[in-house]
Each structure stands twice: as C-alpha cells, then as structure tokens.
Amino acid sequence: MKEIIEKLAKFENLSGVEMTDVIERIVTGRVTEAQIASLLLALKMKGETPEERTAIARVMRGHAQHIPTEIHDAMDNCGTGGDKSFSFNISTTAAFVLAGGGIHMAKHGNRSISSKSGSADVLEALGINLDLKPAELGKVFDKTGIVFLFAKNMHPAMKYIMPARLELGIPTIMNLTGPLIHPMALETQLLGISRPELLESTAQVLKNMGRKRAIVVAGPEGLDEAGLNGTTKIALLENGEISLSSFTPEDLGMEGYAMEDIRGGNAQENAEILLSVLKNEASPFLETTVLNAGLGFYANGKIDSIKEGVALARQVIARGKALEKLRLLQEYQK
C-alpha cells in the first residue's frame, strides 16, 4: 500500500490491475483507515483517470448486493453530490417524474455527507423504508416500477471506506464512484457531477460499465444537476460514441433562476418541497425539477430532445402521475 500511495504522490497513474488490487484489499478489511484516507487524498490531488475509476467501480459492483427483479431496463439518475450547493433534492424529485412517465426508476442514493439532506434522508422523511432486504426491494420494483436502493445497505463493503470519507469531509473518488456502482445492470443513466472537466471521462467510464445510453451533466456554478442559473454542459453516450454539448434555459424556452432560489433545507423541509413539486405548485423548484426530468427522459431515449423531455415532464406532473408514483412507493416500500 505504501508503494501505491508514493506512486500517486508523484502524480503517476495506477494501472487497472493496480487499482483493482488496492480496492480488493480495502473492501476485504486489509487496509488501515489512515491508508485509505491517504489514498483518497492522493487520487484527488493527482486526478482520477477513467481506467482507475472503472477498476474501482467494477470491484465495488462485484461486492454489491443482488436485487432479484423481472425488470431489465432500469434507469438511475443519481449524482455525485459534493457540490456544496445546498439545493433541494433535485434528482430524487425528478426520479418520481421519470417513473410517472413510464421509466423503470431504481433510485440509488445515500445519506448526506456534504449537504443538509441526501436522497436517503428526504425519502426517509417521507416514510420510505431504507432497510428492506434485497428480495423485498425487487418485489417493490416489480410492483411499482420505482424503488429506492440505500447505498449503505447495497454496498456492505463500503463500511471499510466510509469512516475515512466522513473524517475527510470533502468530495473524493468515492463521490465519483457512487453513481457508477448501481447494484442492477442499468441500461440507461443520467449522472450529475460537480466537476465539468470530468464530463467526457465519466461518460467513458459509463461506456466501460456497459451503459447503452447515458448523459453526464454538469450544471452552472458547480451544480451536479442541470441548472436554470446559467449554462449546463452534458456528455451524451449513444451507440458507443460520446459527444459534448451545452444549453441554457433560454435555449429551452425556460425562465432563468438564481442558485439561491433553489436552496433546500433539512430532510423534512426538502420533503415538503418535493411534495409541492409533485403537486404542481409553481416555483423555481418545480421548474428545476421539470428541467432535470426532461433531461432524464432524453438520457433514457424516450424522446428525441431535451425540449420534448421538458414538455413531457410538465404533462406527467400536471396529470398527477409523478405524485402517484410517490404514493405507490410509500405504500410498498414501508
């Protein structure tokens, strides 16, 4: 382990084999907490390569829980977090809109590390049981078309890494890894990151992980979602090719809002915001959700443009389909 950390300290990249070996040792309890923290910091300072990120993702997925389900076209819209925006739970709210639009959503998420309320926190406040067994979660998914997978329970091996992450309290390669290690074999994905310089490389990792179609999104002001406060950049993975583009609210015929307009609060406050959006109450929260759900519909390939996706998202919310999915999840995942 010492040699690996010294190599990273010299800003030398690790091979896929080296990274695989290191992570296998970590997730089987053979590395100290201090060494894990040093590794995470060294990787962050050097900059993580697609090869390193793919290796760690494959190891972590290999140690994940298996969710038995009859659904084979699941999608997730989990982001990396760590953007310090303190926004409401955008992707969690958008997940219900996507599910209401007919997409099988297996929302993967965790408690907050660097914000006030993570996806697990807000859903727990809404009465969702975070601790169902994998077989029970599979049944929920089959019945409702939506399920929440609590990352802490899905990845028991993460217990070896979590203390170092919490002690560091800053985004690391594990933030970048979380959305890549979904327990299910996803076909499509919308993945938000707070570092736009990693758009293309993250799309490459998704390709390596077998995604058929995906979008990696980096919003304005470091937001790990699409934003109405400036230019949003995306990388689209389609037919094995990666293309980069960007858009503004004006491009989509939408009104712009400042970051402070979408600030959230604690889990209970964010739960109230989520409910207000699904009830179609006009606000910057609603508009931001519509934007991100629209991007999700496009990432899934359900429609042919982000603008069409935004229109579909509005219809789904207005018809009560998104709220209906929340009520279903509250009924079955309890």
From Swiss-Prot:
5-phospho-alpha-D-ribose 1-diphosphate binds at residues 79, 82-83, 87, 89-92, 107-115, 119. Anthranilate 1 binds at G79, N110. It catalyses: N-(5-phospho-beta-D-ribosyl)anthranilate + diphosphate = 5-phospho-alpha-D-ribose 1-diphosphate + anthranilate. Binds 2 magnesium ions per monomer. Mg(2+) 2 binds at D224, E225. Its cofactor is Mg(2+). One of its GO terms (cellular component) is cytosol. Pfam families: Glycos_trans_3N (PF02885), Glycos_transf_3 (PF00591). Keywords: Amino-acid biosynthesis, Aromatic amino acid biosynthesis, Glycosyltransferase, Magnesium, Metal-binding, Transferase, Tryptophan biosynthesis. SUPFAM superfamilies: Nucleoside phosphorylase/phosphoribosyltransferase catalytic domain, Nucleoside phosphorylase/phosphoribosyltransferase N-terminal domain. Belongs to the anthranilate phosphoribosyltransferase family. Catalyzes the transfer of the phosphoribosyl group of 5-phosphorylribose-1-pyrophosphate (PRPP) to anthranilate to yield N-(5'-phosphoribosyl)-anthranilate (PRA). NCBIfam families: trpD. HAMAP family: TrpD (MF_00211). This is Anthranilate phosphoribosyltransferase. It comes from Streptococcus pneumoniae serotype 19F (strain G54).
